[in-house]
A protein has these predicted regions:
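Conserved PLP-dependent catalytic core of the aminotransferase class-I/II
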Residues: 61, 271-305
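A glycine-/small-polar-enriched, mobile loop at the entrance of the PLP active site in fold-type I
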Residues: 15-53
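Conserved C-terminal alpha-helix-loop-beta "cap" of PLP-dependent enzymes
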Residues: 5, 294-368
Length: 385
């Protein structure tokens, strides 16, 4: 009988209907990935030797010149920035003085500023912002041209297709890459949540990005504390010199042999996955859920595409005919048995994302939504519930 560690600790398990959010554990690893990690844990190896083989295999799987495993996408942004600064000076990052680092510049679109860019800010390089986070005065190529100078070490770009939560106003990735190429400036793309589709693992770098960073613990379904960097061999020579297990910046971002092997196993499965079958399953479950509530005057189920992260994967919202009820619905979902975790879509709707769910979990969510509908009806009739 397997050990129930969460029960021992008194931590309640949840059905994750929100998606691959870090705050709820990202995604679930497959048994194959778990077995690979356990196998890696049973023996010891020389980390650099394992790292080289894993990175080589990941580069091949993702059709890139090079790859590197980090302990998360945010760590990948920091390592990428440090590597670009080191490349700019032609010296290892730990050998640079604070004054040299502070003189180097990294360009960001104002429309792309977000809490994740702390990975860039903590480098202590100068952040140069361009454009505005709206379409009143859209950013043009000249804005980027004027921002580039002899101190520019890199351009960071937050990639999200239309429909996601990123503000409008930035240059397209294509135009950004074109300007950067004219000046020989590396472009680092933050695409942490941008699989699916699997093709993004090679299309973004194929378009010209020097480094592209993905989360390993989101839809790739690798270890939660893992990230995947892919890109061009020339810049990755600096990443290898900067990242773990090198002393300096890289030492802060340790990656265990279990995470390296686990992420490799996850990527092997992901690129071989039948994405069309998975998409059809999600569409069928959404259609089935909508049918369950066709006769309800209180709840309607709506299909959303793409999802709020801009991913080309369908999800649904449960909308209640009760203004301002979303927080109460979230509370009732969390307090139910089983506990269900999700997020509000607006003041009277909540998300249910099939991406992280199994059939039996969707069934349980539908049952609980009907129970909440009953609770609201009883309250509306003044009954003590």
């Amino acid at each position: 009988m397997s050990r129930d560690i969460y029960r021992e600790l008194g931590v309640r398990k949840v059905i994750n209907a929100a998606g691959t959010y870090t705050m709820v554990g990202g995604s679930r690893m497959s048994e194959e990935t778990l077995e690979a990690m356990a196998a890696a844990a049973r023996s010891q190896v020389v980390i650099k030797e394992l790292q080289a083989k894993v990175n080589e295999r990941l580069a091949s799987l993702t059709r890139n010149e090079a790859a590197f495993v980090t302990n998360g996408a945010a760590a990948g942004l920091h390592i990428a920035g440090a590597s670009c600064i080191a490349r700019h000076y032609g010296r290892p990052f730990p050998s640079l003085s604070p004054e040299q680092i502070a003189r180097s510049e990294i360009i960001l679109h104002r429309a792309h500023r977000n809490p994740y860019d702390w990975g860039v800010r903590l480098l202590n390089a100068r952040i140069v912002e361009i454009g505005f986070p709206n379409m009143i005065l859209p950013t043009v190529e000249d804005d980027l041209e004027y921002a580039i100078n002899e101190n520019t070490a890199a351009i960071f770009y937050f990639f999200m297709p239309p429909g996601g939560w990123v503000a409008q106003g930035a240059l397209s990735l294509e135009n950004t890459l074109r300007v950067a190429a004219r000046h020989g400036i590396p472009v680092v793309v933050d695409a942490a949540a941008q699989v699916p589709p699997a093709e993004n693992l090679w299309k973004i770098t194929g378009a010209g990005a020097d480094i592209c960073v993905f989360s390993g613990g989101k839809d790739l379904r690798g270890p939660q504390a893992s990230g995947l960097m892919v890109g061009k061999k020339e810049i990755f020579e600096w990443i290898v010199r900067t990242g773990f297990p090198t002393y300096g910046v890289g030492r802060m971002f340790k990656v265990g042999r279990e995470e390296m092997v686990g992420l490799l196993a996850a990527v092997e499965q992901y690129v071989a996955m039948d994405s069309e079958t998975r998409m059809s399953w999600a569409e069928e479950r959404i259609a089935s859920a909508r049918k369950e509530f066709e006769g309800s005057s209180m709840i309607s189920v709506q299909r959303i595409y793409p999802n709020e992260a801009g991913q080309p994967f369908p999800q649904m919202t449960f909308r209640f005919d009760r203004p301002g009820c979303a927080e109460e619905v979230l509370r009732l979902l969390r307090e139910g048995d089983p506990s269900i975790f999700t997020m509000a879509a607006d003041e009277q709707s909540v998300f249910v994302n099939p991406m992280t769910l199994r059939d039996e979990e969707i069934d349980a969510i539908i049952v609980r939504m009907k129970e909440i509908e009953h609770i609201f009806r009883e309250k509306g009739e003044g009954k003590d519930v």
